[in-house]
Design a protein with these regions (language model features):
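Extracellular/periplasm-exposed beta-strand and loop segments of Gram-negative cell-envelope proteins
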Residues: 112-114, 120-122, 153-166, 197-221, ...
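Solvent-exposed flexible segments
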Residues: 227, 239, 244-252
Length: 375
């Protein structure tokens, strides 16, 4: 009844006035009307009077960087396999040209990417496995190998309530060849081509709304080539300066979210050409009479070409579209890699490795451990 209602207030502002850059501006009011014509105003109507001012900014919760950041973690998954198969092609493996190796390893891939340039960052954690085989094909052909793997992980938004579960399946072809320069020096050439497909399942929770979910696929290609020169020194030490080229190309499907304030995401792409250049220090000792090889390589990594993923995002609920973009990591970074292997007997060996890459205040980690059998 009239007099029982004081007025309408917005849940967003706590007053009748709505003045927010992320929403349409205006004022709420109310009135009582005589709906049945009996002369008594018994129906309450809420009235919205818009100012006609358009929305000037997109609510940061709606922008959707987590979806586009998925291409970064897909690329990292591909590098977890592609980089590890190259690390297997060390001087000792390439010198054993006629051996056939079957191997398996566990993989770990982790990223702590801070928000940067107004774009939301992410934290990624993933684990999985890979298996492979390689064999020598004569003195002039080097060693060829093939590998398959799978990584399962999830990425979390740094600033909002979003989580993306990722399942990546990968395959890699790799090759390496050793060329003797002298009794104490040799050149190594190696490369790999890795393909990965990632299935994404993202859940977003926007303030005041039920959760929305979106599913889509990413496809990633990674091509790597490396040249290095190893020289032997006194005390069993080896020094290996190296130059590597890494080209990554990723593609993300368009998709539509379901539930909540579901959004429409356009397809996006990632391109990056990186050149790591550095030095590897290694030596081989004995542990309980068994050969034990260790190496540490450090390098500067620079991106000479890069297209950060971006695409159009549309919200049917607000009838608005905008350009969404992934976070842009620093172009320059430092990478450190440690690898070790122990020859258990004539047939069996175990190995492991750890890689750390720092770009500004963001960190990327990869670990691996496995076993190989020679035939």
């Amino acid at each position: 009844h009239e007099g029982d209602f004081d007025g309408a207030v917005s849940q967003a502002t706590g007053t009748a006035r709505v003045d927010d850059p992320y929403a349409y501006t205006g004022t709420w009011s109310h009135r009582w009307t005589d709906a049945d014509g009996d002369g008594y105003a018994e129906q309450l109507q809420l009235v919205w009077k818009a100012d006609g001012t358009p929305i000037s900014s997109i609510d940061p919760e709606l922008v959707g960087e987590l979806a586009f950041n998925s291409l970064w973690s897909s690329a990292s998954n591909a590098a977890a396999l592609g980089g590890n198969v190259l690390s297997r092609l060390n001087v000792f493996r390439l010198a054993d040209k006629h051996a056939r190796d079957l191997w398996g390893m566990g993989l770990g891939d982790f990223a702590r990417q801070r928000s940067r340039g107004g774009a939301d960052g992410y934290d990624y954690s993933g684990g999985g496995y890979s298996v492979g085989a390689d064999s020598g094909f004569g003195h002039d052909n080097g060693i060829w190998g093939i590998a398959f793997g799978q990584l399962y992980g999830h990425a979390k938004s740094r600033g909002f309530q979003g989580r993306n579960t990722q399942d990546t399946r990968m395959g890699s072809l790799y090759w390496g060849r050793l060329m003797e320069e002298s009794r104490r020096a040799r050149w190594t050439f190696k490369g790999s081509l890795t393909w990965a497909e990632t299935r994404n399942n993202m859940t977003s929770r926007l303030s005041g709304a039920p959760a929305s979910t979106g599913k889509w696929n990413n496809e990633t290609w990674l091509a790597q080539a490396e040249v290095s020169r190893t020289a032997d020194y006194a005390g069993g030490w080896r020094l290996t300066p190296f130059l590597r080229v890494e080209f990554t190309h990723g593609r993300q499907d368009a998709f539509r979210e379901q539930g909540g304030y579901g959004r429409d995401f356009g397809g996006a792409a990632l391109k990056r050409l990186s050149i790591p250049v550095g030095l590897e220090i290694g030596r081989t000792d004995e542990w309980k009479g068994r050969p034990w090889a260790q190496s540490l390589r450090v390098s500067y990594v620079g991106d000479v070409l890069r297209d950060v993923p971006e695409a159009t995002v549309y919200s049917p609920y607000s009838d608005m579209g905008w350009r969404g973009r992934a976070v842009s990591p620093e172009r320059h970074g430092f990478r450190a890699e440690y690898n070790t292997s122990l020859q258990c007997n004539e047939r069996w060996s175990v190995y492991g490795g750890y890689s750390l890459e720092a770009r500004g205040n963001s960190l990327y980690h990869r670990v691996n451990a496995g076993v190989a059998r020679s035939f």
